[in-house]
Amino acid sequence: MNLRINKKKFLYLISPNKIYPQFYKDLKKILETGKVGLFQMRLKKYSLTQKIIIGKKIHQICRKNGVKFLVNDDPLLSKKLNADGCHLGQKDMSLKEARKIVGDKIIGITCHNSVKLAKVAIKDKASYIAFGAFFSTKTKKVKFKAKIKILNKVKKLTKTPIVAIGGINFNNYKKLLLNNANLLAISGYVWNNKKYKPLETIE
C-alpha cells in the first residue's frame, strides 16, 4: 500500500512498553489533536491473548480519529486484528512473506542507518522506510546510530515515505522535518516524560 503523507499528521506514535490504567484516555486525547498519522502497538512482554484484547481497544480509538493502526513485528496478529498494517525489523519476517499475509496493507521496514537496506526495502515496495536512532533514547537499547544526512541522501533515491526514530523530542524534531523526514516516530518522550503529561508533550 502506498502511504499518503499528511503534513499536519507528522507524528508516528508508538505505544508505551507497559499499558497503564490511564493509557486509553491519554491515547484518545493525543489522537484528537490531529497531529498523529500512524500508531504502532509495540508490546514485547505481553501474551498473544493480551495483545488481542489491547489491540482491539487501540484500533477502535485509532479508527475514530482517522489514525492508521499498525502492529510491530507480527503480520499474523496484524491480520487477526484487521489492522492497517505492520512494522518489520531486519530480523523479522521478510517483507515479501509479510505481504502474503497482510495483503495490500501498510508494511514499514527498519533500515537502521543503512542506505543499502533502504534500497532493498524500496525494491520490495515497502510502504515506508525507518531510520535511527538519531538521538539517544531510553525506550530501547540503541544498536545503530543514524546521522541526519542519511535522510537527504535517501530522499534523492525515492518517493517512499521516510520515518525518523530515536530520542525525538520538542527540542530536536524540527531539524528532522527540515531534512526530509516525513514522519517522526515517538514513544518515550510522550509516555515516560517526568515533566509533562502525555498530551502536553505534543501540544
Enumerate the language-model features and the residues they cover.
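Active-site mouth loops of central-metabolism enzymes
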Residues: K7-K25, I106-N113, V163-A164, I168
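Structural preference for beta-strand elements that scaffold enzyme active sites
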Residues: F10-Y12, V36-Q40, G66-L70, D84-H87, ...
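Glycine-rich phosphate-binding active-site loops on the catalytic face of alpha/beta enzymes
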Residues: L13, L88-E97, A130-K143, F170-E203
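Catalytic domains of carbohydrate-active enzymes, especially glycoside hydrolases
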Residues: L27-R42, D124
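Catalytic cores of alpha/beta
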Residues: I30, F69-D84, A98, N113-A126, ...
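N-terminal active-site wall of soluble small-molecule enzyme domains
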Residues: L38-I101
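Alpha-helix-loop-beta-strand connector modules within alpha/beta enzyme cores
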Residues: I52-V71, E97-S114, K143-F170, T201-E203
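Glycine/Thr-rich beta-alpha phosphate-binding loop at enzyme active sites
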Residues: K80-Q90, I109-K156, N193-P198
